[in-house]
């Protein structure tokens, strides 16, 4: 009996060693690459001078967007974002509104993680790195330079 118990313990340890390292909460979804801007003026200049199809997307919740947003921005709130499912409503809405050759300029709150996640998701579902761009310091810093 002791030998059987030791066998199961060793088997459990082996399984955890083999599979346990790839199941952390931080890598539940592999995000695609994106372009990050940390300077508001650079983000603004790049957006306004971009010659191809483009979209400015505010990822903040609807109430914050309605209280104030950048001129020309569309609201696709990240709070409905489902990190586990490629067919999440957010992704469907994005793909329905913008062809994958559209350059997406994302901004949100100073909580950079959610904006990073949606830009990474956009990159992965077909927009690619060059068409997935984010401003990482939030709406308040960006509105000071937006004309």
Where are these regions (language model features)?
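Sec-dependent bacterial lipoprotein signal peptides
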Residues: 1-21
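Generic, low-specificity signal for short hydrophobic/alpha-helical stretches with a mild N-terminal bias
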Residues: 5, 55-58, 104
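Flexible, polar/low-complexity N-terminal or interdomain linker segments that lie immediately upstream
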Residues: 13, 21-67
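Rhodanese-like catalytic fold shared by cysteine-dependent sulfurtransferases
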Residues: 23-39, 66-147
């Amino acid at each position: 009996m002791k030998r059987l118990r030791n066998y199961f313990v060793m088997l459990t340890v082996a399984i955890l060693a083999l599979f346990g390292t790839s199941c952390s909460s931080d890598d539940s979804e592999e995000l695609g690459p994106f372009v990050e801007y940390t300077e508001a003026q650079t983000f603004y200049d790049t957006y306004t001078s971009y010659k191809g199809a483009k979209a400015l997307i505010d990822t903040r919740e609807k109430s914050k967007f309605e209280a104030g947003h950048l001129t020309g921005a569309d609201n696709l709130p990240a709070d409905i974002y489902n990190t586990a499912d490629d067919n999440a409503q957010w992704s469907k809405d994005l793909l329905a509104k913008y062809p994958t050759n559209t350059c997406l300029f994302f901004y949100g709150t100073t909580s950079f993680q959610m904006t990073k996640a949606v830009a990474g998701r956009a990159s992965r579902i077909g927009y690619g790195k060059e068409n997935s761009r984010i401003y990482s310091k939030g709406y308040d810093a960006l509105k000071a330079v937006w004309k």
